[in-house]
Design a protein with these regions (language model features):
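C-terminal cap of thioredoxin/glutaredoxin-like
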Residues: 3-36, 40, 44, 111-217
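Structural alpha/beta surface segment adjacent to cysteine/selenocysteine redox centers
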Residues: 24-131
């Protein structure tokens, strides 16, 4: 049986980050494998890879080529590697040269509210699936409202939030906090506010770390 308080896991990530989707799936599999041994509570913290992205988004291949100075062939190779990692975790990545990258700030605002309602994990999974598997525009209010409903949230309240600046200040404050703590890349998984696990690690790496931190807690 698990002992003591549940581990606090702060998962810093962006909705448009494929390695964040892989990292979350790995973390969740690790926690499932450790059921009865380790208990934990996941909290999602916001990080925007492209905070200046316009509302219409941008072709993802062109964006990655310009941002990282790589070729279209290298983008394709990276996607193939991500697809393979995803398949092993049951995550379907259907990205291609027509995929687009979108602004994710409103998605982060909804996620902040969803945690207050206890539905943040369901919404996060819905957002990742919509973007990476279905190719949906996760900046579009209609998409966000549909996903909020799928996650068991009140869509009327979600619509009010999206039509206002609700939780914008809170999201900005959290983004700034984790930047001040040195988080420059995501995913970043922080255990009990002290231990950092960087990147989309495989489940066994999370298992080992979580078991170690739980024993030391």
């Amino acid at each position: 049986m698990p002992n003591g308080q549940p581990l606090r896991i702060d998962f810093v990530s962006d909705v448009s980050c494929p390695w964040c989707a892989i990292g979350l799936a790995s973390l969740q599999r690790a926690l499932a494998n450790l059921q009865g041994e380790v208990t934990a509570q996941i909290h999602f913290q916001p990080f925007e890879l492209n905070p200046q992205m316009p509302s219409e988004g941008e072709n993802a291949t062109e964006h990655l080529m310009r941002k990282y100075g790589i070729t279209a062939a290298q983008v394709d190779a990276n996607r193939a590697a991500i697809r393979a990692r995803g398949e092993a975790l049951g995550v379907a990545f259907r990205m291609d040269r027509h995929s687009r990258v979108y602004n994710t700030f409103d998605a982060h605002r909804l996620l902040h509210w969803a945690e207050l309602e206890g539905r943040h994990v369901a919404l996060k999974q819905a957002l990742l699936r919509a973007y990476f598997s279905d190719g949906d525009d996760v900046s579009a209010p209609a998409t966000l409202l549909r996903l909020a409903g799928e996650a068991g949230l009140d869509t009327a309240r979600a619509q009010q939030i999206l039509a206002s600046n609700a939780f914008a200040a809170e999201v900005r404050a959290q983004e700034q906090l984790y930047q001040q703590r040195g988080i420059r890349a995501v995913p970043a998984t922080i255990i009990n506010g002290r231990h950092l696990i960087s990147g989309g690690q495989p489940p066994e790496a999370f298992e080992q770390a979580l078991r170690q931190f739980a024993a030391a807690a």
